[in-house]
Curated annotation (Swiss-Prot):
Pfam families: DHHA1, tRNA-synt_2c, tRNA_SAD. This is Alanine--tRNA ligase. InterPro entries: aa-tRNA-synth_II, aa-tRNA-synth_II/BPL/LPL, Ala-tRNA-lgiase_IIc, Ala-tRNA-ligase_IIc_anticod-bd, Ala-tRNA-synth_IIc_core, Ala-tRNA-synth_IIc_N, Ala-tRNA_ligase, Ala_tRNA_ligase_euk/bac. The keyword Ligase applies. Zn(2+) binds at residues 566, 570, 668, 672. It catalyses: tRNA(Ala) + L-alanine + ATP = L-alanyl-tRNA(Ala) + AMP + diphosphate. It comes from Lactococcus lactis subsp. lactis (strain IL1403) (Streptococcus lactis). GO terms for cellular component: cytosol. Its EC number is 6.1.1.7. GO terms for molecular function: alanine-tRNA ligase activity; aminoacyl-tRNA deacylase activity; ATP binding; catalytic activity, acting on a protein; transferase activity; tRNA binding; zinc ion binding. Signal peptide: none annotated.
Length: 872
């Protein structure tokens, strides 16, 4: 077995399959593109779904990749086991209807055992297979595997409900008896017992059948197109090749661990548990790559995952004795380890560090706040006579505030509390089950559409034409290819001026005419067929026949509106980079007829000043009437030109580069204006957050922009009339004057309210009642608003009238409740929570004063009557 670095292992895998005629697919972003079923890219095949379901046919049916992936359903196991990671790399080879079982097995055995490649000892490799899959067994024997090393496993069958399915075969490496102290041997593999001896390094899925849950598996029909999907974990391979005890004892993690040693003053040892070192090293990799790909910490979705990873890493840093912020300082090390294949971490190093540093600073403040929450919780439990900290409370502090369980338990035990360990485990298990349930299990192979996949005719889109003569080559109705269609159908022509929806640009609409110029069909939508042809969805008015020529004519006004928005999107993208920063990566776009929508990554709301500058800059470029040039070239030349690839686009060998003066240059397959002046005008109408770390700008161009400005002008004129400003230029001064007058009136009103409260107070406060050793006042009062209750409470505080004050008032349709306390035995916040339900309300506050709001005025008498009972 050869000695290799992780970079060499990755490259050798890719080189091997390249030598076998595979195209190397680049690693895609961890943030899925156009796939709502996935929170993260979680496997090597996840980015290739479109090929497996037949919606797109690849130029080469043989593919290979090294794909970064994230899985977070078992975060708690990271650091505890030898091989659990949140971010990992999957090496894979794939066949889309090309080779199958024979070649896949031969390739795997050659790569692993040949002296030209990894040169693993054959006697160290064991293979599992599906018992009924005798063909796979025979293929392994053919390539030279010892039959005693072939282990049948009933679970070796891949299927998720109805659809493509098939047996899989897994390759394991035997690390020897040193990792099998009980000498269990092959039983570990045969009975799927968790162990450190037999390490799975490669899984080959043979997508062969069309699963149908209503029939036995043995009767599943075969798929028309059989596929191969394999996955090899890079971290595991490197661990075996480099002789590491765990995946962390390799060149993928050890440089990070060495930096953690420097920061903590502690020493890492492969023979010790070292959980904190492992957690930090794993989590900083995930954070660096995910943030680099545009995901940002937040309170939901991907953002929540990143926030949780960061907080877990910080707490393990504290366990190692690291004081202050430290995580961001590890990012350059991550970048250097991975730079040979993933240069983006170093390229975005400053931005990644900025986000991590800011998030860590926020969490350190959260830790301080969490300490106060625990102190308050324990104090309340003591006042209620309880000596047990419930598991649900421990979990809430952990899950909501990121406060470490061990620290919560330690503080509670110091105060004499018993710990509900079982309750915490139940709450944690429930959360893990929710997390697993939230993961939509999407496999590599979706349903195959044979009809569309079978269309292989040549079809060309004519960028510059608005109308053209096209020959009807294929017509589809009710999912069948027919010679003549009427009603709703899908059509493919040899040439077409109709743009198929792609890259955020909506499809062209229009008409199809016959030789006499009569409209015979309306084009309602255009999409790409699996082999790339423009597939026209039409409603026919007269029958259309294959082989005949027709005039294809797009809706020119619709196209003109769409291209204005598309070109403006390029200008907006460039302006965002100039003003907000290069981290503002495109996260989606839509170029419609009426508007454009642009989603981008950014960690804060775009300020009004920034929006104004973006709008000004885009309009400046529009008015310069810059030429919009389109160049067709190869991908390498395009990148040398500095062209920026747009989010979610798949580019072939030849690409189109859209260049707008020296202001913008992007790879883009869409249609555009000829000059920027054709856009006319650009106006941002909305900026909003649509998810953790993702912002959205909606804008309009041309006539719609003029209408938006006109609407704003009309609104300003109406405001001028309302505030009696002679001219719109005087509206601001007039509104400011009115605000000053309002503030004066409010001060006078507050003063009158105070006097009113003082005049009422003698009557309200004279009815003092007793509950045990406490004196209290409980009264319904008439006040204009909640401030009236506070004014009365202020007067009560200045006098020695009672220990507790409870005031309730009906204000409009609502009920307001105030509780104040001078007694250390009564917490106002607790009492208000007990009383609020009488008026269908809720609230809270501090020990000395708390308030609540409700909606059930009929419950006021019952509330007042209950005060004595609650205080007794």
């Amino acid at each position: 077995m050869k000695t290799m670095t992780s970079a060499e292992v990755r490259q050798m895998f890719l080189d091997f399959f390249k030598s076998k005629g595979h195209t190397v697919e680049p690693s895609q972003s961890l943030v899925p593109v156009n796939d709502p079923t996935l929170l993260w890219i979680n496997s090597g095949v996840a980015t290739l779904k479109k090929y497996f379901d037949g919606s797109v046919v690849p130029e080469n049916p043989r593919l290979t990749n090294a794909q970064k992936a994230i899985r977070t359903n078992d975060i708690e196991n990271v650091g505890k086991t030898a091989r659990h990671h949140t971010m990992f790399e999957m090496l894979g080879n794939f066949s889309i209807g090309d080779y199958f079982r024979k070649e896949a097995i031969a390739f795997a055995w050659e790569l692993l055992t040949s002296s030209e490649w990894f040169e693993f000892p054959a006697e160290k490799l064991y293979i599992t297979y599906y018992p009924a899959d005798k063909d796979t067994y025979n293929r392994w024997v053919e390539v030279g595997v010892d039959p005693t090393h072939l282990v049948p496993i009933e679970d070796n069958f891949w299927e998720i409900g109805a659809g493509p399915s098939g047996p899989d075969t897994e390759i394991f490496f035997d690390r020897g008896e040193v990792y099998d102290p009980e000498h269990v041997g092959l039983k570990l593999l045969a009975e799927d017992i968790e162990n450190d001896r037999y390490i799975e390094i490669w899984n080959i899925v043979l997508s062969q059948f069309n699963a149908d849950p209503s029939i036995p598996r043995s009767e599943y029909p075969e798929l028309p197109q059989k596929n191969i999907d394999t996955g090899m974990g890079l971290e595991r391979m490197v661990c075996i090749i480099q002789g590491g005890k765990t995946n962390f004892d390799t060149d993928l993690f050890l440089p990070i661990i060495r930096e953690i040693e420097k920061l903590s003053g502690k020493t890492y040892s492969p023979d010790s548990e070292n959980m904190s070192f492992k957690v930090i090293a794993d989590h900083i990799r995930s954070l660096s790559f995910a943030i680099g790909d545009g995901a940002l910490p937040g309170n939901e979705g991907r953002g929540y995952v990143l926030r949780r990873l960061l907080r877990r890493a910080v707490m393990h840093g504290k366990k190692l004795g690291i004081q202050g912020k430290f995580l961001a300082s590890l990012v350059p090390t991550v970048g250097k380890i991975m730079q040979s294949y993933y240069p983006e971490v170093l390229e975005k190093e400053d931005f990644i560090m900025q986000i991590i540093d800011r998030e860590e600073e926020t969490f350190n403040r959260t830790i301080d706040a969490g300490q106060k929450l625990i102190d308050e919780l324990l104090l309340n439990l003591k006042s209620e006579g309880k000596d047990r900290l419930e598991g649900a409370d421990i979990f809430r502090l952990y899950d909501t505030y990121g406060f470490p369980v061990e620290l919560t338990e330690e503080l509670a035990e110091d105060e004499g509390f018993k710990i509900d360990h079982e309750g915490f485990k139940v709450a944690m298990k429930a959360q893990q089950e929710r997390a697993r349930a939230a993961v939509v299990k999407g496999g590599s192979m979706g349903a195959q559409n044979e009809t569309l996949s079978s269309i292989e005719v040549e079809s060309e889109f004519l960028y510059e034409d608005k109308t053209t003569q096209g020959k009807l080559l294929v017509s589809i109705q009710d999912d069948e290819i027919v010679d003549e269609v009427s009603g709703k159908a899908q059509l493919v022509f040899d040439v077409t001026p109709f743009y198929a929806e792609m890259g955020g640009q909506v499809a062209d609409h229009g008409v199809i005419k016959d030789a006499e110029g009569q409209v015979v069909a309306n084009v309602l939508d255009v999409q790409h067929a699996p082999h790339g042809q423009n597939l026209h969805s039409v409603e026919t008015l007269s029958p259309l026949k294959v082989g005949e020529s027709y005039t294809l004519e797009i809706d020119k006004e619709r196209r003109a509106a769409v291209v204005k928005n598309h070109t403006a999107t390029h200008l907006l993208h460039a302006a965002l980079h100039n003003i907000v920063g290069n981290h503002a990566l495109q996260a989606g776009s839509l170029n419609e007829v009426e508007f454009l929508r642009f989603d981008f990554t950014h960690f804060a709301q775009v300020t009004k000043e920034e929006l104004a500058e973006i709008e000004r800059q885009v309009n400046e470029v529009i008015w310069q009437s810059l030429k919009v040039e389109t160049v067709e070239t190869d991908i390498a030349t395009a990148k040398e030109m500095g062209a920026m690839a747009l989010f979610g686009e798949k580019y072939g060998k030849n690409v189109r580069v859209v260049k707008i003066g020296d202001y913008s240059i992007e790879l883009c397959g869409g249609t555009h204006t000829q000059t920027t002046s054709e856009i006319g005008l650009f106006k941002i109408v909305k900026e909003e957050g649509i998810g953790s770390g993702v912002r959205r700008i909606i804008a309009v161009t041309g006539q719609k922009a003029y209408e938006a400005f006109k609407d704003a002008e009309n609104t300003l004129n109406e405001v001028a009339t309302m505030v009696k400003a002679p001219q719109t230029s005087q509206v601001l001064a007039k509104v400011t004057s009115l605000q000053d007058e309002l503030k004066t009136a409010q001060k006078e009103n507050d003063a009158l309210a105070g006097k009113l409260a003082a005049s009422q107070s003698d009557e309200i406060f004279k009815n003092v009642q007793t509950a045990g050793s406490l004196n209290f006042i409980a009264s319904e009062v008439t006040v204009p608003d909640a401030n009236g209750l506070r004014n009365l409470a202020d007067i009560w505080k200045q006098k020695e009238l009672s220990d507790v004050l409870v005031l309730v008032a009906k204000i409009g349709e609502k009920v307001s409740l105030l509780v104040a306390s001078k007694s250390s035995d009564v917490k106002a916040g607790n009492l208000v929570k007990e009383l609020a339900p009488f008026v269908d309300g809720r609230g809270g506050g501090k020990p000395d004063m708390a308030m609540a709001g409700g909606s059930k005025a009929a419950g006021i008498p019952e509330l007042l009557a209950a005060v004595a009972e609650k205080l007794a």
